[in-house]
Swiss-Prot record:
Name of the protein in question: Eukaryotic translation initiation factor 3 subunit B
Compartments, record wording: Cytoplasm
Composition skew (Acidic residues), residue ranges: 15-25
Family: Belongs to the eIF-3 subunit B family.
Taxon lineage: Eukaryota, Metazoa, Ecdysozoa, Arthropoda, Hexapoda
GO molecular function, one term: RNA binding
Coiled-coil features, chain-numbered ranges: 595-645
Keywords assigned: Coiled coil, Cytoplasm, Initiation factor, Protein biosynthesis, Repeat, RNA-binding, WD repeat
WD repeat residue numbers: 207-246, 293-331, 334-369, 442-484, 530-575
Gene that specifies this protein: eIF3b
Matching SUPFAM superfamilies: DPP6 N-terminal domain-like, RNA-binding domain, RBD
Matches recorded under PANTHER family: EUKARYOTIC TRANSLATION INITIATION FACTOR 3 EIF3 -RELATED (PTHR14068), EUKARYOTIC TRANSLATION INITIATION FACTOR 3 SUBUNIT B (PTHR14068:SF0)
Region (Disordered) location: 1-37
GO biological process, alphabetically ordered: follicle cell of egg chamber development; formation of cytoplasmic translation initiation complex; regulation of translational initiation
Amino acid sequence: MAKKKSEEQSSADANDSDYQEEPNFEDPPGFVDNISDEDLLGDMLAQRPSEADGVESVVVVDNIPKVEPVRLEKLKSVINKLFSNYGDIVNVVYPVDEEGKTKGYAFMEYKQASQAEEAVKKLNNHRLDKNHTFAVNLFTDFQKYENIPEKWEPPTVQTFKVQSDLYNFINDPDTYDQYCVAAETAPNCVQVGFWQNVLPEPFELETRERFTDTFVKWSPLGTYVVTFHKPGVAIWGGSSFQKIQKFPHPGTQFVEFSPCENYLVTYGPTPTGQKIIIWDIRTGAEKRSFVADGMSVLSMFRWSHDDKFVARMGENSIHIYETPSFYLLDLKSIKIPGIRGFSWSPTDNVIAYWVEEQNQIPARVTLMEIPKKREIRNKNLFHVADCKLHWQKSGDYLCVKVDRYSKLKKDKKDLDVKFLGMFYNFEIFHMREKEIPVDSVEIRELILAFAWEPIGNKFSIIHGETNSSNVSFYEVNKGVKPSLVKRLEKKSCTHLFWSPRGQFIVMANLTMGTFEFVDSTNDYIITSSPDHFRASEVEWDPTGRYVVTGVSSWKVKEDTGFNMYTFQGRIIKRTILKNFVQFLWRPRPPTLLSEEKQKEIKKNLKKYYAAFEQKDRLRLTRASKELLEKRSQLRETFMEYRNKRIAEWADQKSRRIMLRGHVDTDNLETDEVDEEIVEFLVKEEVTLLE
């Protein structure tokens, strides 16, 4: 027993010896910490509660009527109806005097602070009647105005920053297009290279390491490129892609530019939902913010073609905001019970939306003119399961793809709905004709894809079974029903990509990586059928001269890169790039030439052919000369390296002879070599003869 205790004691002493004295984590005397809390814990401090938390959603309404208790309920109903247009009201307090008479002001608490701010903007100085005009303020404004210093200090003068030319990329006399290539070099670290597509080989303009965390995106006119980072996003531009503006929105997942590049919308998650912020690109100022319950169709904003309006869909309504104030159009939403989707015309301030079937009332597609809110065309539809709105790029036509059913099956509680006997209609709206006539095309097969010709009057569809589908081309003309002009049968394709200039189309199977180039003006012949295994993207350049197919590392990890083709499908460049992420052509702004001037140039184009061909020959000759000079320089460099190594090899001969037993192995004759032939059995075959 004593022996056991002594063993335990020795074991405890050994364990105690393993634990040394704890280190001292205190700062040494005279230590000065140069790192502020904001730099060290900026992301956490941004979420700490402020003193105003809890009252920032409260508004104070002054100059309301002073009424007796008998009339108080009526006053409450009037004011609540007015203020509830801007959000959900949680609580209302009407202070009263000893006699029960209101004191002429009230406190209202909204569910969200943004709703309170909206109510202040819209209802401050609102005239209730000839004797009462509201004075509406945020509750937090009282403390803000109390802390205003009595002595005014002039603002500091900021130095003027000279900005580079943002449109230098269109000043190239030969109008070569630019593109960017992104490749991931490390987790959350993407390298981006910018290139100019010159002949005979593209020219590298700029390469940026660690340029973005995920991917990049061009603005609609090609002026800016946006990068994504943990604190927010940044836009770059100019000749060397300098930083133009940054927008602090942590965790931004997606951005969207307005068509004229005046505004930027950022979408990023928050602990309470999805935060959406609209920014002014030139000033970097936040114009408006929203909180949504997640990334859904309801949270997406859609812009008018001229940046004058931005709209989003709400529950049974459309919210249209005017720029630059971002107030609701006419200070109220457009109530549309049963709305399921909407889309702006790409060239006019016209909104198309569709409404689902309700209580034996048919579904409806409506065209509404903004800002007048005037309905210019309606189309009733029956037995509708879903609709998709497809505008032609020129705004000449609108196609509504209608998924229709023959029979509807519901369960007892109407929770599960099944559509049986599906077929499809294409409702074509002729936007440029009087009273906007509508034509209909019915297809009894499954529709896999739809695409308008950007410039022209044709559209194409993929229909049938997935593995053996058909591609049909229709032509739309004035006064006649859309006609089928060509059907290509048994085509294994999943997507359709029209050239931005029309005429040529790529039928792609992005599952197998096969492509077919079709000329729609030459009896729809297939000019080429290349393949690019595992290709996941197709990009036309803005002029319609080149097509790029890419295999992204987002899809696979091996053999990533991109191929470049002519518009007829001839391969001109293959690039294998490790961890390739994306390829994007730089968009071009619209031409400044009038339609008459463009027609004149096209008419006299033959006059310019000789000059263009001569310039191309000179460029190719110059390029060939430069290539020969480059090869000659490489050969000279190699021969210099080779001669240097031969000299080193000769200097080491004595050392080699000594190490090899005084045998000069550099000049061995074949007679001194013994050759031995060895045979061994590889396999044995037995053949039976009858």
